[in-house]
Amino acid sequence: LPVLPSKDSGSLKSLPIIFKRKALVNLYFLTATLVTAHFIAYTYIEPFLLQISGFSEGFATLALLVYGLAGIGGSILYAKSNEAGFCRNIFAPVLGIIISLFLLQYSPFYLYPLFLVAFWGACIMLFSLNGHERVIRFASDATDVAMSLYSGIFNIGIGAGALAGGLFVTQMGLSLIGFYGALLAVPTLIFCYFIQKNA
């Protein structure tokens, strides 16, 4: 097989340069905060649907399936949208996630949670794809290092969200788990403004 040299992958020497790029650092902060907020609620969505909303186990499983399928739908929307399209604006999915978290505790009719998790799932996928695309754009000369950092920060957000969600559930119960996540996520709109400004 032919040798394929790695281009613009960067190295550990690239770290100081990466952290001097304000747009990229803002994106890292946005990702850490929003993913933490998201997983405060998502980690406990099944017990929330069962114990608070009063749905059956079958319905909770269906809701998780709809969430996953909506994520696939979000990726298709992103792929088909142009650079100036609504789906490529990072502000839109962030706002969508915040709205989803705020509305989680309301269940006015039976199918409402399915519509909500579908919207939520599409938004988190759009956010993830927006984030990846911007990392590549903001660090085109050190893509591998910048993307590794982004993936690590995303995973830290998952763990932090699960931990924080567990503390909220233990201390204050499940009923407002989405509200707690939304409160943490609201300040991320500030990061969105600066990221979009430098996009």
Where are these regions (language model features)?
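Residue-level signature of mid-helix packing/kink "hotspots" within the transmembrane helices
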Residues: 68-76, 158-159
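Helix-to-loop junctions at the C-terminal end of transmembrane segments
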Residues: 73-86, 169
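C-terminal membrane-cytosol helix-exit motif in multi-pass small-molecule transporters
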Residues: 1-7, 191-195
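C-terminal transmembrane helical hairpin of 12-TM major facilitator-type secondary transporters
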Residues: 86-131
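Juxtamembrane helix-start elements in MFS-like secondary transporters
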Residues: 55-64, 109, 113, 143-147
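A late C-terminal transmembrane helix in Major Facilitator Superfamily
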Residues: 137-174, 178-181
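Multi-pass alpha-helical transporter architecture, strongest
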Residues: 182-199
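Extracytoplasmic gate region of multi-pass secondary transporters
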Residues: 23-64, 69
